[in-house]
Amino acid sequence: MEKFTVLTGIAAPLPMINIDTDMIIPKQFLKTIKRTGLGKNLFDEMRFLEDGAENPDFILNKAAWRKATILVTGANFGCGSSREHAPWALLDFGIRCVIAPSFADIFFNNCFKNGILPIALPQVEIDKLLDDAGRGSNATLTVDLENQVIRGPDGGQIAFEIDAFRKHCLLNGLDDIGLTLQKGDKIDDFERTRAMSSPWLPIAKAV
């Protein structure tokens, strides 16, 4: 998993509440188990018209926000089904940070496991960031995970909270597999000890 330390980029304002996972990545695109290739269908029903053409009114189709890496949005983001394809689609599009007043629990947890930083802030601070994001490519936000602050284009700072363990995992690029591999020596020691104390177990397992 790619490390998350400091992210400076364009923020796209999407001030909608209750954006569910089917809006993030519709069900017809869930047949794949690959984490790549889903970005082109992110927010598919909002980004594209019925004839397949881009919706010119959708924020990510506008020139100033096409390369957004930060999303500032409304409350209860990621509600609905537990599909992990939702953070996959965001990440594949290029979104590394989502800032909202609140998140659905499962989506919130899945973000951390896929290298995306979800930040929950009071609505008054979201409103300020939405205003900043509305400037498009003329203004960028900087998300500093180590110091737990968001810096706006005017030099102002907004502090945010994050669980210490999740912060450690993002800073070091550790997903569940990465965390397990850190214990590789201990796992190998256990397997050697088990093979000597219970030599029949590997044979029984093979059968």
Curated annotation (Swiss-Prot):
It comes from Rhodospirillum rubrum (strain ATCC 11170 / ATH 1.1.1 / DSM 467 / LMG 4362 / NCIMB 8255 / S1). CDD domains: IPMI_Swivel. The lineage of its organism: Bacteria, Pseudomonadati, Pseudomonadota, Alphaproteobacteria, Rhodospirillales. The gene is leuD. It catalyses: (2R,3S)-3-isopropylmalate = (2S)-2-isopropylmalate. Heterodimer of LeuC and LeuD. Signal peptide: none annotated. Gene3D superfamilies: Aconitase, domain 4. One of its GO terms (biological process) is L-leucine biosynthetic process. This is 3-isopropylmalate dehydratase small subunit.
